[in-house]
Amino acid sequence: RAVWLTTNYGLDWPRNRLSHEQQKKELISILDNLKKWNFNTVLFQVRARGEVLYDSKIEPMSSLIVGNPGSKEKFDPLAFVIEECHQRGLECHAWVVTYPLGGDKHVRSLGRSSVTKTNPNIVKKFGNEWYLDPGNPRTDDYLLSIVKEIVTNYDVDGIHFDYIRYPDNRGRFPDDDTFKKHGKGMKRDDWRRDNITRFVTKTYDWVKSEKPWVTVSSSPLGRYRALGRNGNGWTAYETVYQDAGKWMQLGKHDALFPMMYYKEHLFYPFVDDWIENGNNRILVPGLGPYQMIELGWSKQDIINQVDYVRKKPIHGQAYFRADNLLSNTKEIMNSLSEYYQFPAKLPALTWLSDEKPTEAIDLRAEKQDDGIFTLKWDEPKESNGNRVTYNVYRSEDEELDINDGQNLIA
């Protein structure tokens, strides 16, 4: 049960005119509501178009943070949101927009700190927008340095890649020189797909070598490949060179959140196609409640999709974006609350280890001065210094069913 919490342009958070203290209160309110509605995963946008929302030595802090009135104190949004998420039992995944860098005006606003100035050899201008060049191996190194900075310095639960693809206008990206230098005799379409797969592989291998519990995921286009008459025109594989199914088959992704912001014949067959290509790893369709505003979808359009995916071997739902849910557009949350009455367990990364979870040691109830009992326990010895999380269950019966969501309280 995930949401994309969008910081680009302050769409979900933060509002540019607020002080840091007000921004913190606003973010806490969002997280409190997600917890109240029994969500468990926040995809928090930490990088968008060459600027970031954490303390970085590589890229500049977002102007939405540094440009606020009364902002003399140092504020690290990623550190703050991780702490607040974990206090509420929410996972926090660092959402990283990969290749797009923005238009001329945005790039100029970053001055000499823009990657177009610090690393001009790995960028391309396409139309009115700047992009990192996926075909240049040094682009991999640059993006991986950002991932390393985040994973090393922050207790994130996941790294989540967005726009991990070529721009939409197929074949026109100006990479002739890069292809000539690095193409290795491949067809250009295959070479472009291989470029992104190469970066995915490098990143996954590094993350798992450092913090194997950190989930590596991405949000590819919602239609993997053209299926007969369905989905022609804009697909991940054919149009923007995302071979996301291959990433799963190679074991270089833990999860996919395909952006399935379509209806009917452009939705249902593609859910099944993702299942076929998911390699039994975590698959979480991204649903688009924002379409109720932009395209006039009914609430029932979203609910029908939730019904469908919950009957499939799928591991949850994600929603774009937070405000479209929490503002209760067309009373969507009233309906979703019937599905999310109780907390839900997160799927385990069973391909990393098939060991069963260990029990807490020396579980005890201690009575406090106010008469309240506090549960306490010791960390399992098997943790070996790794971060440990717990599920807490409660039942009034002697037999406790851990598969019954009503018994999961924290």
Outline where the language-model segments fall.
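Active-site clefts of carbohydrate-active enzymes
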Residues: 5-7, 214-233, 270-305
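Active-site-adjacent "subsite" loops/lids of carbohydrate-active enzymes
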Residues: 6, 10-25, 83, 93-153, ...
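The substrate-binding groove and active-site-proximal loops of carbohydrate-active enzymes
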Residues: 10-21, 60-75, 126-144, 185-196, ...
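Aromatic-lined carbohydrate-binding/catalytic grooves of carbohydrate-active enzymes
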Residues: 37-73
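Polysaccharide-binding and catalytic clefts of secreted carbohydrate-active enzymes
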Residues: 39-40, 47, 79, 88, ...
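Substrate-binding cleft of secreted/luminal carbohydrate-active enzymes
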Residues: 244-267, 281-353
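Pro/Thr/Ser/Gly-rich low-complexity, intrinsically disordered linker/stalk tracts
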Residues: 331-386
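Recognizes extended acidic, P/S/T-rich segments that occur
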Residues: 387-410
